[in-house]
Design a protein with these regions (language model features):
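Glycine-rich phosphate/cofactor-binding loops in nucleotide/flavin-utilizing enzymes
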Residues: 2-5, 17, 68, 72, ...
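Glycine-rich beta->alpha junctions and the first turn(s) of the following alpha-helix
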Residues: 3-8, 182-280, 346, 371-372
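C-terminal helix-coil-helix/basic helical segment that borders enzyme active sites and/or dimer interfaces
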Residues: 24-34, 249, 253-261, 276-309, ...
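Internal helix-loop-helix
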Residues: 47-114, 152-158, 293, 341-344
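A short, Trp-centered hydrophobic/proline-enriched beta-strand micro-motif
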Residues: 114-123
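A structural signal for short hydrophobic beta-strand segments in well-ordered beta-sheet cores
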Residues: 134-136
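A short core secondary-structure module
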Residues: 140, 146-183
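Glycine-rich phosphate/pyrophosphate-binding beta-alpha loops
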Residues: 148-153, 228, 345-352
Length: 372
């Protein structure tokens, strides 16, 4: 639980709080974003505080922090609700974890150093008739198909693409984005500000040496990365709930034209109590899931529970916060209005809530896995 952290994890939290102080000191541009100079300063601060390498493997100079340590830091950063948290961590290995030889030299290491950018091409468009396919042809694979919701794909130097090989095995291929036949056919933006592209692969020749692992390992590699991201989203959700709680408490305790603070009203207190219950339960769920993940067992089901519960609780908490603050919370640019748009996507990212519910039930009823 958050209050029973050992000294090492309390130190992680203290360093994250120091990084938050650095974020507060940054000047913002006209759009409310961190400037280029500010980004460089925050990246330097993250290295100084030992945060930058937490997401990176030891073999590459990182500290390769565990799930609980990352949860503590991510929750602390999110609780500040400030631009700049993205600069706390260095790029993680993602599906390239464990890559050797050419893939390590030309893709993994440059990505970890920030020299190259990667994007994850996993999802087919809804109207796709088949999976993106890679046909073996001599010393190359010939890739045809389409991927949607490739976040950051327009800026990526290379793509990690889930493909189906002859015979049906799924695999991950590393594809340079400037390869002939890789076509960005649509750019779009989601409500929280994420930038995505739809990419078509038209007879794209990819060296066989760009196969990550072995045929059949594509889905397990992808799901390992997705699992890490789900826990990240749960930690972000709980941190944002802490920020909302503090904001609403200040509002309810403030002077009111009636002469009595809103927080003195019984109906308001009932709704605020519901928010607190959601936040307490979410944090308990999150921290238990992180500890299970650190224990070395397969924590896929527990992480699913944390992701679904925490992101849905966040939606309820933000919605009630707007109700308690009133109409001005819907004014464009109000922090709750911005948060309302931002958090809705969390219930869909890395697996929509009901899809994850089905997987959770399958884990127990079909595979007899998972803890309560």
């Amino acid at each position: 639980m958050p209050e029973s952290l050992d000294s090492t994890h309390r130190e992680h939290r203290a360093r994250a709080q120091q990084f938050v102080a650095r974020m507060r000191a940054q000047a913002l541009d006209a759009r409310g974003h961190i400037t280029a100079a500010g980004a460089a300063e925050l990246t330097s601060a993250a290295r100084e505080l030992g945060l930058h390498g937490m997401t990176q493997p030891r073999a590459s100079g990182g500290s390769e922090a565990g799930a609980l340590a990352l949860t503590v830091v991510r929750e602390t950063l999110a609780a500040a609700n400030l631009p700049g948290a993205r600069y706390a961590f260095g790029p993680g290995p993602g599906v390239l974890a464990g890559a050797e030889g050419e893939l390590r030299r030309d893709y993994l290491e440059p990505m970890l150093r920030g020299v190259k950018r990667a994007a994850f091409a996993f999802t087919e468009p809804r109207n796709a008739l088949q999976h993106t396919h890679a046909r073996a042809e001599g010393d190359a694979f010939v890739v045809n198909g389409e991927k949607a919701y490739v976040t950051g794909g327009a800026e990526a130097d290379f793509l990690n693409v889930l493909v189906e090989l002859d015979g049906g095995a799924r695999a991950m291929l590393v594809v340079d984005r400037d390869t002939a036949g890789v076509n960005l056919v649509e750019h779009f933006r989601s409500t929280e500000g994420g930038q995505h592209v739809r990419i078509q692969f038209d007879n794209v020749r990819v060296p066989t040496s760009h196969l990550l692992g072995k045929p059949g390992q594509g889905i397990p590699r992808a799901m390992l990365q997705i699992g890490h991201t789900r826990l990240l989203l749960a930690a972000e959700a709980t941190g944002l709930m802490l920020w909302v709680d503090a904001y609403v408490a200040d509002h309810l305790l403030a002077a009111h034209p009636t002469g009595t603070p809103l927080g003195a009203r019984e109906g308001v207190r009932l709704r605020y109590a519901d928010m607190r219950i959601d936040i307490f339960t979410s944090r308990s769920t999150l921290y238990r899931a992180a500890r299970i993940a650190d224990s070395g067992v397969n924590a896929m089901n527990e992480v699913v529970i944390a992701k679904v519960f925490c992101t849905e609780a966040l939606g309820r908490v933000v919605d009630m916060a707007i109700q308690l603050v009133g109409g001005r919370a819907l004014d464009a640019g109000h922090p709750l209005e911005q948060l309302y748009r931002r958090v809705r996507s969390l219930r869909i990212a890395e697996g929509a809530s009901d899809l994850l519910r089905l997987n959770l039930a399958k884990g127990r009823l079909d595979l007899n896995k998972g803890n309560l």
